[in-house]
A protein has these predicted regions:
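ATP-binding N-terminal substructure of ATP-dependent carboxylate-amine bond-forming enzymes
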Residues: 1-99, 103-105, 109-112, 128-139, ...
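Active-site nucleotide/adenylate-binding loops and adjacent lid/helix of ATP-dependent enzymes
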Residues: 14-19, 51-53, 57-62, 101-196
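Short, flexible turn/loop "capping" segments at secondary-structure junctions
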Residues: 155-157, 231-232, 294
Length: 334
């Protein structure tokens, strides 16, 4: 097995790309270099790694890997499932472990952890699909009385802004909850932040993480939804974001605090909402497997911080090997 100090360029790695149908399309759009990606095909045996026509295919049997670099979005990819598989296989992998991945995917669980750590989050309500189906009126009243309008409605366990809606009145709220319930049994309803600016910050490291300069997403639509992310080019980015020095340092501090709160490792992109009217900063969510092309926000924020894309990849592989080596030193029985 290769050591972290060895030359990263000599390591043998695999990138995993798959996930549920709802987020697979987003992955293929976000990672256009598809001919170099290995795809796990659910219709075949787990031994086989297959790719779409013309793409690279390989089999696990006989394939020696030093490290796995998951670039999967959505359920089974970034919720701790594939991370658990790699733990069982005792294979080093880039990024968050099982716990951080599962908490990072579940928006309701994530908010509970952030609140317990005293991190600033907007008001929210969790709705269970079962309760919604039993008594829509009671749920509607509870949500409106606590949060008012407008609100954002999200499936708790889904990525790429799939199933997210903004509701400005009761009719839209009912429609939004019904849509989110198509994707998850648990729905998160959040109070909208007035005149919100969407600020992001990249975090890199294991037990001593560092934060990049923040960047800003300026959506071409009312908010940064699935279409704005993947299907049109009206949104733009500003890196570094136009912020005061104090705001920049607070965002970087909170990004690291959020990373540590869920025991994250390797990488994460932490998303914030900055209220335009008051300047109040809210922690929105943490993404344990952010988009990772050369033009993605995560890599661009690190590039603006002085870390090139090749060196970023090298660093993440080194962190994965370091984390795995630490685990090998731990006792698992008395």
């Amino acid at each position: 097995m290769m050591k972290a100090a060895d030359t990263i360029a000599d390591s043998r790695g695999a990138r995993l790309q798959s996930g549920e149908t709802e987020t697979r399309e987003a992955h293929l759009v976000a990672h256009p270099g598809g001919d170099t990606l290995l795809t796990i095909d659910p219709s075949t045996r787990s031994e086989e790694l297959s790719a779409r026509s013309g793409q690279v295919a390989a089999t696990v049997s006989g394939l020696t890997l030093d490290v796995v670099f998951p670039v999967l979005h959505g359920p089974y990819g970034e919720d701790g499932t594939v991370q658990g598989l790699l733990e069982l296989a005792n294979v080093p992998y880039v990024g968050a472990g099982v716990l951080a991945s599962s908490v990072g995917m579940d928006k309701a669980a994530m908010k509970l952890v952030f609140a317990a750590k005293g991190l600033p989050i907007c008001d929210y309500e969790v709705v269970l699909k079962r309760d919604w189906q039993r008594d829509e009126r009671a749920i509607m009243n509870a949500v409106v009385n606590k949060l008012g309008f407008p609100v954002f409605v999200k499936p708790a366990n889904l990525g790429s802004s799939v199933g997210i809606s903004k509701a400005k009145h009761a009719t839209e709220l009912r429609t939004a909850i019904n849509l989110a319930a198509e994707f998850d049994r648990k729905i998160v309803v959040e109070a909208a932040v007035p005149q919100a600016r969407e600020i992001e910050c990249a975090v890199l490291g294991n037990d001593e993480p560092e934060a990049s300069v923040p960047g800003e997403i300026i959506p071409g639509r009312e908010f940064y939804d699935y279409e704005a992310k993947y299907l049109d080019d009206t949104s733009r980015t500003v890196i570094p974001a136009t912020l005061t020095e104090r705001q920049t340092e607070e965002i970087r501090r909170l990004a690291i605090a959020a990373f540590r709160a869920i025991d994250c490792a390797g990488m994460a992109r932490v998303d914030f909402l900055l209220a335009g009217d008051s300047g109040v900063l809210y922690l929105n969510e943490l993404n344990t497997i952010p988009g990772f092309t050369t033009i993605s926000m995560y890599s661009k924020m690190w590039e603006a911080s002085g870390l090139s894309y090749p060196k970023l990849v090298d660093k993440l592989i080194a962190l994965a090997l370091e984390r795995h080596a630490e685990k090998q030193q731990l006792r698992t029985s008395m």
